[in-house]
Amino acid sequence: MKLTKYLILSAALVLAAGCAEQKKASTIGADANLEARVERLLSKMTLAEKIGQMNQVSAGGDVSQYADAIRNGQVGSILNEVDPVKINEFQRLSVEETRLGIPLLVGRDVIHGFHTVFPIPLGLAATFDPALVEEGARIAAIEATAQGVRWTFSPMLDIARDPRWGRIAEGSGEDTYLDARMAEAMVYGYQGREADTTSMAACVKHFVGYGAAEGGRDYNSTFLTERQLRNFYLPPFEAAIKAGAMTLMTSFNDNDGVPSTGNTFVVKDILRGEWGFDGLVVTDWNSMGEMINHGFGEDRMDVAEKAANAGVDMDMMTFGFLSHLEELVKEGAVKEKTIDNAVRNILRVKFMLGLFEHPYVDVEAAKAVQYTPEHLAAARRTAEESAILLKNNGILPLKGKGCILVTDPMADAPWDQLGTWCFDGEKEHTVTPLKALQERFPGQVTYVPGLRYSREKRERFDDVVAAARGADVVLAFLGEEAILSGEAHCLADLNLIGSQSELLAALKSTGKPVVATILAGRPLTIERDLPNCDAVLYSFHPGTMGGPALANLLSGEVNPSGKTPITFLRTVGQAPLYYNHNMTGRPYQGETLLADIEPEAGQTSLGNTSYYLDYGAYPLFPFGYGLSYTNFEYSNLSLDKEEYSSYETIAVTFTLANTGDYKGTEVAQVYVRDLVGSLTRPVKELKCFERVELAPGESRNITLQIPVQDLAFWGLDGIRKVEPGQFQLWVAGDSASGEPVSFSVR
């Protein structure tokens, strides 16, 4: 996908830019044509200068560490520096003390907010609200670019079906369609619908299949076929590229034996060849060097050659390009035109961001855009929409003036509340649930710490249980610390860690109603805890304003509307379990569980169907699930036609009614099943969703449009197309509900 949407802006920046900030950059010329500017600069560069642009270094700390390398034209990008004073100095070195004055591209992991931290991406996906997610990404870009960060290594688009994998927190869950919609939203948010000096280049990652790591262990191998890649794992990346994503990152994993950073098929053939991507491709941290560990290359020279010829433009922290590309070009192992094309892609991004015209930032002005009331309000709204009500026996919303006991370990954990992969959030600005509840219910809240952190043992249980006996309701804030999810933080046991389940049981033994609010980076296995809870509100680490959001939800000021973006397992032994699995030859038709088997039973296949003897076939909560304080009813589902051609659009009409007592928002979800195909097809696939707000007693007729082309898949013949035949379609509040209607495609 050609990066043309920012061309007009490039011209505008050139015309508007003053000379004070440019100095040597002004020698490049003020040509409004982006490609002409790129070619003009490229033609002036020596081979060594070109290779320098392909080198990225981690420059956090002392500016002098890389000052000489920058002066010598050996650095094209830095990461891990957010101090605007230092960034300005790095830029000054590059713009004013190098021959061509090419500015640096400054990168940072701005994953779910910069200073104002939003819910982790798995929580963002739980909103099913792309517009709100785009707003959050726009705020992150405004805050980060004000300090000189013009490139974020986000969004992560790895489909993840195994909650043991720590980085499940950083993505949008298990569904391809939802992931694609979130990808588009974050790209639009980071880069802006129209580029300006607050545009921060998005970097979609990790290309590709990283989330399918075998056994849920980070960095592990993946074994995905081409059809699996094309039907499930690649579409979110393609959607992000079509939305204008400027950059892409390769992944750590090897798929079917080929490490991503040296995978010509996915990078050069699909990304570059089929999709026409002319943006910047960067390695993940030392993933070029790690190809040596994979056994895919002998040394840094070998893997540098493989990465360059696969279509990688920039090396993050291996220094393989810097050390060996010039020699590889002389030997003919890498063509100079390959280097030229890589540098074109790098320069193109720098021009599109306006870095040649605006390499510096206003240090004082940067402070004014952090933690603004508008940003904090958006973070609160997002945290509200991301929370999922999993159980409610009528105890929520909180009523009356009674005594509320609040207990740990997540009630007053300002750092852990921010979630994983959060480098610039500050716990001093975090509003915790305890603080927010004390403000919401003045004089009613008693706080008794039970566990200081999620892994602590039960030394203080007696104090908490005694306090519970005197309370009218117990609010237990449970979950996992931020450090327990994220990169390299995988778990084999997904139960509430430490003594938290024991704490819940002890609280329930008092006979008082217990509300569990769980803050975590993944879907934990909480089946054993449900009997000890009268209500469960699940919040994937909610960020800076998680406290006010949860207080609003628990009090009924806001009605929960979040939906599960990932299947919640009954036990870790079910992993991976996901809703859009293929139909088997022996689909589920009932089960015989362990308790049903007689002693010395004769050998039998116990029903000839697909399930576990101890845990059955179904998850604890399916994809798309989430309760409300009100009730929603679906009716009158119909389609505008019974048969469609492959280029028509299906009009799906249904009635949604709020039959309860509270105003609420329902996420109406449309699922489709292809009954017969040239390949076995998923039992259901999400094809559309819509957030609908209804007042008590209100009903609304809703029509959603689904292009028939959205039913296409990559088949045996290596072509993506819609196959004619019979289909079923559901509209429901989750992936396991509703009655289908039928249609056909000719």
Which residue ranges define each predicted feature?
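Bacterial Sec-dependent N-terminal signal peptides
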Residues: 1-27
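Glycoside hydrolase catalytic-domain context in secreted enzymes
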Residues: 18-714, 721-735, 742-746
